Amino acid sequence: MEESWSAPGDIEDAVRVVDRWAPIVHAIIRATPQDKLVDWKLVYRDPLPTWISPKARIALLGDAAHPFLPTSIQGASQAMEDGVTLAVCLELAGKVNVPKAVRAYEKIRYNRVMAAQKTGETTRDKWHKTDFDQVKANPASIKLPREKWLLDHDAEAHAYAVYADTAASLRSDVEARPSL
């Protein structure tokens, strides 16, 4: 599959995708000038093995570290959690321990972010493989769960609570981590 931000779209391909949708949707697509139609694919990315440089002086945050599908409804939230966690780690480590802060940031965030990414896959599958006749019979079947672990998390408080133990654990496993 070709990836591009600006690959030209095809009106007939778009109409096929919405085959069973309301006629007004078909009319809107057919009224779109061909040269204005973009085939913008949503592409999944497996989690990176690490978000930090080998010397832990550079850290990726947000979509640069862990791109989310739009169905995750978590991209911006997770980027903010990254930012506040890194800020807490830098504050607590101090200027002389930036590499320790960066490593702690990754360790604190990594597993939570991977789990959050998986929610996007689940939602994507639920929405893209929907039996709309079943939804019509039971509208609640399409409702997404409100996952407290994801939506009610206080990343700043969490970072303050776990930083000391996380930083202490880094001494033994720094050499074992993959490098970027």
What are these regions (language model features)?
Residues 1-180:
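FAD-dependent flavoprotein oxygenase/oxidase catalytic domain
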